[in-house]
Amino acid sequence: MGNLTSARPAGCKIVETLPATLPLALPTGSMLTYDCFDTLISQTQRELCIASYCCNLRSTPEGGHVLLRLLELARADVRVTIIVDEQSRDADATQLAGVPNLRYLKLDVGELPGGKPGSLLSSFWVSDKRRFYLGSASLTGGSISTIKSLGVYSECEPLARDLRRRFRDYERLCARRCVRCLSLSTRFHLRRHCENAFFSDAPESLIGSTRTFDADAVLAHVQAARSTIDMELLSLVPLVRDEDSVQYWPRMHDALVRAALERNVRVRLLVGLWHRSDVFSLAAVKGLHELGVGHADISVRVFAIPGAKGDAVNNTKLLVVDDEYVHVTSADMDGTHYARHAFVSFNCAERAFARALGALFERDWQSSFSSPLPRAPPPEPATLLPVN
């Protein structure tokens, strides 16, 4: 299967949350999310910036400890800024209120051009513009201990500064600054990497002239795939949904089909299954799975956490192409996520790191928590009717 911790491009480490029911069955050499967050807090000397959909750390003991560490850090004269979505519940707001050097801000993505409802889906930390975490673990106790998640920790200072630029734009949006007043700048993008890595963004209104739209980054590599596409996610929804309309969004779905049918690329999707699974996602991946006949090598499996309660789910968001490119994010392959929600993804084209994450995907794909979707039975051979 390979060494899960062998590759360190841009000072990268793989970060995971594995619920208590999984570690024995899913061996890992990855850094744990709890340890990653604790390390970031310990290393910060000047400022710590955190973007997350919500802040609900007290839901588990481990999360409660992280909250206490954040409060201690702020009281030690270190600036701590937490940005969450405008619509999120203020579960920890009372504990955060009135703490010196700590700001708790809310971002209304619906204020972006277009005026459509949206959410902040970003999940990242930036410490002193020198180190960062980005992944699917939000600022909740569940993400630290009960929800399977994946992220990347890096001490690459140029990348950390580039991610801090995104946070600065979020801060200004919280202050109701118009998008035209934002720099929306980046040093690295699809055509210019830093140690084989760069960030991509959504929605398009936060791209500016130099950033890479996240869907474009993903599609560029899926459409260039030569041998394998492995994708682990919570949902794949080929729709953009508004309150009063639904628009078909086939870009990702069609790119996967074309890769398998036209270029003989092996396509594997591992989809998290839970009580809130999107019915359109299940229908879409079943359709892809049924195409896996003849020369088309497409297969779909579902990953379910045994005895899962509440929001316990496989929230890993990972794409590995040809064991050469990886994409780690907090969003799903969902048209609405790309069109309406705000998030940042990590992209890396370093072969050894891609192989390490490919080994992690293989571990999950082959695990006892993964099961194949049943295929429809083949049709009966056609019978020629007599001609009268």
From Swiss-Prot:
Name of one Pfam family that matches: PLDc_3
Lipid linkage positions (N-myristoyl glycine): 2
CDD domains referenced in this protein's UniProt entry, alphabetically: PLDc_vPLD3_4_5_like_1, PLDc_vPLD3_4_5_like_2
Metal-binding in keyword set: no
Keyword Transcription: no
Location within or outside the cell: Virion membrane; Host endoplasmic reticulum membrane
Segments of this protein annotated with the region Disordered: 369-388
Gene Ontology molecular function: any one: catalytic activity
PLD phosphodiesterase domain boundaries: 310-337
Highest taxon, organism lineage: Viruses
Membrane topology: Lipid-anchor
Gene Ontology CC terms, in alphabetical order: host cell endoplasmic reticulum membrane; membrane; viral envelope; virion membrane
Keywords: Host endoplasmic reticulum, Host membrane, Late protein, Lipoprotein, Membrane, Myristate, Viral envelope protein, Virion
Protein's job: Envelope protein associated with the inner side of the enveloped virion (EV) membrane.
Protein name per Swiss-Prot or TrEMBL: Envelope protein F13 homolog
Organism: Molluscum contagiosum virus subtype 1
UniProt lineage: Viruses, Varidnaviria, Bamfordvirae, Nucleocytoviricota, Pokkesviricetes
